[in-house]
Amino acid sequence: MGVVVDTSALVAAERLAKPEGSTGVATWGRWIGRLAEEPAVLPAAVYAELMVGVLLADTPTRAAARRAKIEALTLRVPVVDFGPAIAEEWARLFATLSRRGELIPANDLAVAATARHLGFSVLVGPSDEAHFRRVPDLDVRTLTGEG
């Protein structure tokens, strides 16, 4: 099995391990290295969320540091496009969760659809665990202080 990495897992990894003042590139690199035993991918929606962080950075230095982290990450973890098959899975999940009155944010739905389409688990941060657990037939792994 592989793992689809959600933005919340990347944020949690950085908060758990980043030394004050660090750019975080080494932190993400060490953490992603732990996933070497299985394939890991980033959904296109996660890549988009990361790029928003670059574009909304309050200084050019911070924008450059964020872009460097993303570039380092995507050298080791490929981005999976949101193509027709994943879009259909997204629609199935939307319909299911909508009928149950348990919709989750659209980007997180795209992450879940990517994981289900690939037959992968999804790695999330503690902040997003509850709503990912609403998704049927999705193996949710939560990044904690233990790794």
Where are these regions (language model features)?
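Short, hinge-like loop/turn segments at secondary-structure boundaries
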Residues: D58-T61, L97-S98, D139-L143
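Acidic, PIN/NYN-like endoribonuclease modules and their adjacent C-terminal/linker elements
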Residues: A112, R116-G147
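A generic structural signal for short hydrophobic patches within well-formed alpha-helices
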Residues: L10, Y47-L50, A87, E129-F132
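Residues that scaffold the ATP/ADP-binding catalytic core of kinase and kinase-like folds
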Residues: A12-E14, G53, W90, V135
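Histidine- and aromatic-rich ligand-binding microenvironments
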Residues: V5-D6, P43, I104-P105, P126, ...
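Active-site neighborhoods of divalent-metal-dependent phosphate/nucleic-acid chemistry enzymes
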Residues: V52-L55, R76-L123
